[in-house]
Amino acid sequence: MSMFCYQCQEAAGGRGCTVKGVCGKTEDIAKTQDLIIYVVKGIAIYSSQVREIGLNTSEADKFIVESLFSTITNANFDAKALNARVQEGLKIRQSLKDAIIKAGGSYNSKENKSWTSKFLSVLGIKNDKDEKEIHDAAVWAANNPEDFKKKAETVGVLATENEDIRSLRELLTYGLKGMAAYLEHANNLGYDEDSIHAFMEKALVATLDDTLSADELTALVLECGKYGVDVMALLDKANTSTYGNPEITKVNIGVRNNPGILISGHDLKDMEELLKQTEGTGVDVYTHSEMLPANYYPAFKKYKHFVGNYGNAWWKQNEEFEAFNGPILMTTNCIVTPKASYKDRMYTTGVTGFEGVKHINASKDGKKDFSEIIEHAKRCSSPKEIEKGEIIGGFAHNQVLALAPQVVDAVKTGAIKRFFVMAGCDGRMKSRNYYTDFAKALPKDTVILTAGCAKYKYNKLDLGDINGIPRVLDAGQCNDSYSLAVIALKLKEVFELEDINELPISYNIAWYEQKAVIVLLALLHLGVKNIHLGPTLPAFLSPNVAKILVENFGIGTISSVDEDIKMFMN
């Protein structure tokens, strides 16, 4: 069977990639990622039971989160690293099973018959006619890449035959991948929440359960949105407690004459470590793409060698990385297949990877040594200037709420007629130019609320301001869509409305990968309706599942700029 992947917006033909991913991943990489997800589901079968009896699940929790994150679009293209992850997962699964067996002796008693039944069931032992055999995901075994390949052939997306069940299982899985990305960043800053891990396990196990109906899976998908809100709130707390609340900031987009390091991705802990280790070395640091919002945090402003932002959204990196001249550190997705001209200047860390690119691992205490990339930078020329000037951002919820009287007054007086949430992702399809044209064509009495790399379609346009309020308010990274929800809920309270949908806010969201999925599910959980997704609806939504979203939540797509603006403004 050939590969099949339809998790991102660029799925070939709007249906799915079957030969090679549009993202660049090979058939082998795609299938190994399928197998990683299968291994994670097997681990969840055991870890959910280990958690229930009060034993430590931290190793499994960490592995599940990192593994889900490693399979996000454009995160990891390193076959060796991915196969090693499969191997590690099987060892963790066995250790969980051993823990259950060990615990069985003390829990297996006349006073605890329910545990006895559960204990036997989770080990795959049928002790009465109602017991189910344990799923293959919890018991299959192999120890080499060739056997992994054979197994991967049988566990991909299409292994679920029913189109609607498959669609719901994948929608849930992609939501979990986005959730894992945000949880990983919070964990890196020392913040965690057991209930989120417990839900992830429950949801993963549910995707293996053939007895669950479409309605039951739909309920789980919506519950995933609840935990999506929780994980974004946790990450917001982690980021702001550690680095301060983002504040209105003018960000330099030009260059200086020193050698530099370009840091891309989302991990603020990596950003902090890099800034600390480069201080006093003569090496400047620039952000790229989704790392732009690091410029908004007070804690990073003390570093004089932190210059600003270089370049645009992830998909332009081939030309921009080439022009930068210095080394590039990829902390998370999105990686585009590197050109030979800069591949030897590229470094990955965390769950990211690309074959032939140097990887920087963390030590046991979580610290990372960036000395190699710093020394590399010293041997390089300074960045080539590709643009100059400034852009403004830092409008996360704390900053916007500080401006609440000004914003509320502008709404009450009619100076601001409507807000447009245009958060989400950018991508290489030409149809995404719609979002630039949409921003340009919006009436002058409207304000754009954005987060994520979708901002690059319009954050360098001169759209002016309304009574001193910029018409583009950038909250930050894609996870900072949470800020936009907080702002909306506060406005609902201020205007004494019963329903969040009564606010003069429209949602025209550009999606690309799985973090956008968890953001969407979170918004649905908060009761937001009539969200428009583009440039196309996800390929993984079957007609029936799409119908559910349309009928219950008013989900729509985009048409033309003029037609859509007319529709939104009426």
From Swiss-Prot:
GO terms, molecular function: 4 iron, 4 sulfur cluster binding; hydroxylamine reductase activity; metal ion binding; peroxidase activity
Keyword Nucleotide-binding: no
Key words of the record: 4Fe-4S, Cytoplasm, Iron, Iron-sulfur, Metal-binding, Oxidoreductase
CDD domains in the cross-refs: HCP
Localization in the cell: Cytoplasm
Cofactor: [4Fe-4S] cluster; hybrid [4Fe-2O-2S] cluster
Binding residue positions for [4Fe-4S] cluster: C5, C8, C17, C23
Transmembrane stretches, start-end: none
One annotated GO biological process: response to hydrogen peroxide
Cross-referenced InterPro entries: HCP/CODH, Hydroxylam_reduct, Prismane-like_a/b-sand, Prismane-like_sf, Prismane_a-bundle
Cofactor binding comment, as recorded: Binds 1 [4Fe-4S] cluster. Binds 1 hybrid [4Fe-2O-2S] cluster.
Record flagged with keyword Protein biosynthesis: no
GO terms for cellular component: cytoplasm
Role noted for this protein: Catalyzes the reduction of hydroxylamine to form NH(3) and H(2)O.
Protein's name according to its UniProt entry: Hydroxylamine reductase
Organism: Clostridium botulinum (strain Okra / Type B1)
